[in-house]
C-alpha cells in the first residue's frame, strides 16, 4: 500500500472482523488486546476506539472507558451510536445531565436510533419525569417492535403512574408486557393498569356505577361488551386486582352467574369471560367473599358434577368453569376425567396440570434435618396451607450483572471492596417462598450458583416448577429451617433473607446462623418489618386476638369482608395494600402465626452484635425522599438520621426495611 498519510491507513478487514467477533462472543481480553493494537497502529481509526470503550465498560473499568469513549466521539462527532455509548457511560458514572445531552445528540443525528430513545427514557425516569420516560420508551418500541429492554423499561416506569385520562393507544403495549417475557411482576403493574381502565368508556359505563347487572339480559350485555376490552381480560388472568371497585364487580358477576347458571347460553363470549374469571379466582386464591346462599349452590353444583362423572356423563364447560371460580378443581378426584376443558388449554393446564406437577415435585425436594422448633413448625404449617405467594409471571433483569456492577447500582458503602472481585458467587436465599425471590437472585448475579431454602414443601414445589418452566439451571432448592443451616457445611459470598427473620421465634438466633455462613467481607441482603410502619397492622392483629378470629379460609375471608365494610381509618388503610387482594398475602399481612417488628436503633444494635456493617437501603424512592427531607448533603448510611426521618414519615417502610450489610 502506498503511504499517502497516516490518517488514510486502515486496519485489515480481517482484523476488524476478529475484533467484532471477540466482543460479540464475550472474549473481552482478546478484544482489548486487539483494539489496543489497532488504536496504537491506527490512532485515528474511530471504530477501534469505540469497541475498546465498550470492552473496558464490560470489564468494569468505567473511568478508562469514559476517556476512550470521548476519544471515539471526538474522532467522529457525527456517529450517533458513539454519542449513545458515551451517554451510557455518563449514566453509569451518575453524570445524568451529560448522559441526557449525549442521548439527545444521538437522536438528533439519527432519529430512528431506538436504543438512544430508550436510554433517554431511563434518564427521564431517574429525574422522576415518568410521562416523558414512557413516551421515550414508546418511541423506541415503535422504531423497534421487538425491543425487549424498551418494553421492560416501559413497564418499570408505568407501574408508578396513576392515570387521570383515557389512553387506548397504550393497550397493545400493556398487553404485550403482560403476555410476553417477564418484564415486571403483573401485580406491580396492576394498580397503574386499573387506573387507566377506569377511564375507559366501557368501564365507566358498565363497571363503576352503583348497581351492576341484576338480571340475565344485563349480565349478557356486560359480558359481550367486556369481551372487546382485551386488556382487562389479560390482566385478570395473571394477577389479583388491587381495587375494591373491580372486586365488587367480579364478586357480583360471579354470584349472578352461579345463581342463573342454567339460563346462561354457552356463547364464546360467556365461556371466555368465565374462563378468565376462574383463572383470576385461582390466582387470588379464592379471596372473594361468598354468601351462605352461594356456598349452598356450590355444594349442589359439586354434587351434580360428581354424579354426572359417576354416570360417565360429561358436565358442560360452563358448570366446570363456574365451580372453578369458587373452588380449586385439582382437589376433586374426578378432575382428570372431565373433557369440557380440553379446548380451554390454559384453564386445564393452570388449574389442574400444574398443581399435579407440584404434588410430584414435593417428593423430589431434598430435606436438611427435621423442623423441630415449635414456631418454625407453625410457620411451616401456614405456608403448606397457603404457599406464599401464588404468581404467574415475574420481573427479571434483561441481563445478569457482576457484583461490582450491582454494588455500584445500589450505591453500597462497602467496608472492603474485595467482594467485588468474586466472579462466580455462591449465594444463599434463606426463605425463598414460591420462588420469586430465588429466581430473581439467580437471574441478577452473573455466573452465580444459588441455594434456596424454605420451611414449606408446597412453596418449594411451586418454586421448583416455576424455575424449571423458566429454564433456570443455576438454582437448587432444599427444605430446611434456618436454625439448622449450619449443617450445610458451606460458606457463601452473598446471603439474602427478606421477610423471613421477623417470623422466627428468636430472629437474632436465625440471623446469627446466617452470619456464620457468610464469608468474610461477604454481603447480606435483609428485609425486616418496621415497628413504626406497621402500627395499624399491629392494632388489627390485636383485634383478631380479642375477637378470637380463626385462621380457616372462611374465617379469614369473613374478617376481611368486615374490614371492607368498616369506616375505621386504619381498616380502610389496609384495603389500600396490594397484599389485601389474595389469600396467602392477606394471611401473611395480618394473620401470620409469628411476627416481630423492629426499629432502626434496634437494627443498628443487631448489626453491631453480629459484626455486620450497614451498606445502604435498597429502595431508591425512599432514599430520594430522605434526601429531600433534610434538604442538604446528608449521610444516607447514618441509621440515626434514618430513624429521625422515619419518625417524621412513619409509613416510609410500609413494606419492610430492605437493606444490604457486609461482614466485617
Model regions and ranges:
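Alpha-helical solenoid repeat scaffolds of the TPR/TPR-like class and their adjacent stem/linker regions
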Residues: 1-423, 439-442, 490, 519
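Rossmann-like AdoMet/SAM-dependent catalytic core
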Residues: 180, 229, 559-664
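Conserved SAM-binding loop of SAM-dependent methyltransferases across substrates and taxa
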Residues: 434-447
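Conserved SAM-binding strand-loop segment of SAM-dependent methyltransferases
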Residues: 471-483
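A short acidic, Gly/Pro-enriched loop at the edge of an enzyme's catalytic core
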Residues: 485-495
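A short SAM/SAH-binding and catalytic strip from SAM-dependent methyltransferases
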Residues: 493-507, 530
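A short glycine-rich, Lys/Arg-flanked "PGG" loop and its adjoining helix->strand segment in the class I
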Residues: 508-520
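Conserved class I S-adenosyl-L-methionine
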Residues: 523-572
Amino acid at each position: 500500500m502506498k503511504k499517502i498519510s497516516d490518517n488514510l491507513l486502515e486496519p485489515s478487514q480481517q482484523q476488524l472482523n476478529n475484533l467484532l467477533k471477540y466482543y460479540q462472543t464475550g472474549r473481552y481480553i482478546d478484544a482489548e488486546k486487539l483494539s489496543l493494537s489497532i488504536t496504537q497502529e491506527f490512532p485515528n481509526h474511530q471504530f477501534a476506539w469505540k469497541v475498546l470503550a465498550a470492552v473496558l465498560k464490560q470489564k468494569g473499568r468505567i473511568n478508562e472507558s469514559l476517556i476512550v469513549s470521548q476519544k471515539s466521539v471526538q474522532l467522529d462527532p457525527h456517529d450517533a451510536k458513539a454519542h449513545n455509548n458515551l451517554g451510557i457511560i455518563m449514566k453509569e458514572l451518575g453524570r445524568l445531565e451529560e448522559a441526557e445531552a449525549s442521548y439527545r445528540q444521538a437522536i438528533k443525528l439519527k432519529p430512528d436510533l431506538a436504543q438512544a430513545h430508550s436510554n433517554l427514557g431511563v434518564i427521564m425516569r431517574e429525574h422522576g419525569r415518568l410521562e416523558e420516560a414512557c413516551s421515550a420508551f414508546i418511541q423506541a418500541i415503535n422504531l423497534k417492535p421487538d425491543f425487549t429492554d424498551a418494553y421492560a423499561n416501559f413497564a418499570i416506569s408505568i407501574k408508578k403512574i396513576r392515570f387521570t385520562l383515557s389512553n387506548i393507544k397504550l393497550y397493545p403495549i400493556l398487553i404485550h408486557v403482560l403476555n410476553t417475557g417477564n418484564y415486571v411482576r403483573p401485580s406491580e403493574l396492576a394498580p397503574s393498569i386499573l387506573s387507566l381502565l377506569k377511564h375507559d368508556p366501557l368501564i365507566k359505563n358498565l363497571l363503576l356505577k352503583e348497581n351492576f347487572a341484576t338480571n340475565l339480559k344485563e349480565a349478557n350485555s356486560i359480558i359481550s361488551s367486556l369481551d372487546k376490552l382485551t386488556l382487562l381480560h389479560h390482566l385478570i388472568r395473571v394477577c389479583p386486582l388491587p381495587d375494591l371497585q373491580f372486586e365488587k364487580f367480579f364478586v357480583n358477576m360471579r354470584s349472578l352467574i352461579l345463581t342463573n347458571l342454567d339460563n346462561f347460553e354457552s356463547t364464546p363470549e360467556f365461556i371466555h369471560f368465565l374462563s378468565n374469571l376462574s383463572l383470576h379466582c385461582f390466582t387470588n386464591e379464592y379471596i372473594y367473599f361468598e354468601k351462605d346462599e352461594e356456598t349452598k349452590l356450590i355444594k349442589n353444583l359439586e354434587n351434580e358434577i360428581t354424579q354426572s362423572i359417576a354416570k360417565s356423563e360429561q358436565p358442560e364447560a360452563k358448570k366446570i368453569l363456574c365451580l372453578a371460580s369458587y373452588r380449586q378443581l385439582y382437589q376433586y378426584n374426578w378432575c382428570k376425567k372431565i373433557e369440557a376443558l380440553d379446548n380451554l388449554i390454559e384453564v386445564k393446564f393452570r388449574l389442574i396440570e400444574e398443581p399435579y406437577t407440584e404434588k410430584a415435585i414435593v417428593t423430589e425436594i431434598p430435606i436438611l434435618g427435621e423442623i423441630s422448633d415449635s414456631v418454625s413448625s407453625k410457620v411451616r404449617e401456614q405456608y403448606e396451607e397457603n404457599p406464599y405467594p401464588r404468581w404467574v409471571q415475574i420481573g427479571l433483569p434483561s441481563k445478569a450483572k457482576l457484583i461490582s456492577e450491582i454494588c455500584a447500582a445500589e450505591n453500597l458503602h462497602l467496608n472492603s471492596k474485595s467482594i467485588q472481585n468474586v466472579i462466580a458467587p455462591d449465594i444463599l436465599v434463606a426463605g425463598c417462598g414460591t420462588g420469586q425471590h430465588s429466581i430473581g437472585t439467580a437471574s441478577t448475579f452473573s455466573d452465580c450458583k444459588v441455594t434456596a431454602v424454605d420451611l414449606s414443601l408446597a412453596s418449594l414445589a411451586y418454586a421448583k416448577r416455576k424455575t424449571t418452566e423458566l429454564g433456570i439451571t443455576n438454582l437448587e432448592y432444599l427444605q430446611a429451617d434456618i436454625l439448622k443451616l449450619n449443617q450445610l457445611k458451606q460458606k457463601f459470598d452473598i446471603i439474602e433473607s427478606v421477610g423471613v427473620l421477623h417470623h422466627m421465634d428468636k430472629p437474632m438466633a436465625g440471623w446469627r446462623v446466617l452470619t456464620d455462613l457468610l464469608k468474610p467481607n461477604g454481603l447480606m441482603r435483609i428485609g425486616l418489618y418496621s415497628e413504626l410502619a406497621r402500627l395499624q397492622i399491629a392494632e388489627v392483629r390485636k383485634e383478631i386476638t380479642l375477637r378470637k378470629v380463626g385462621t380457616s379460609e372462611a374465617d379469614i375471608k369473613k374478617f376481611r369482608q368486615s374490614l371492607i365494610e368498616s369506616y375505621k381509618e386504619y381498616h380502610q388503610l389496609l384495603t389500600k395494600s396490594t397484599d389485601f387482594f389474595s389469600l396467602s398475602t392477606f394471611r401473611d399481612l395480618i394473620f401470620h402465626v409469628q411476627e416481630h417488628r423492629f426499629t432502626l436503633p434496634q437494627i443498628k444494635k443487631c448489626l453491631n452484635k453480629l459484626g455486620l456493617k450497614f451498606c445502604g437501603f435498597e429502595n431508591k424512592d425512599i432514599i430520594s425522599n430522605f434526601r429531600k427531607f433534610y434538604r442538604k448533603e446528608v449521610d444516607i448510611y447514618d441509621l440515626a438520621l434514618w430513624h429521625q426521618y422515619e419518625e417524621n414519615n412513619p409509613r416510609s417502610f410500609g413494606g419492610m426495611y430492605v437493606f444490604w450489610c457486609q461482614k466485617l
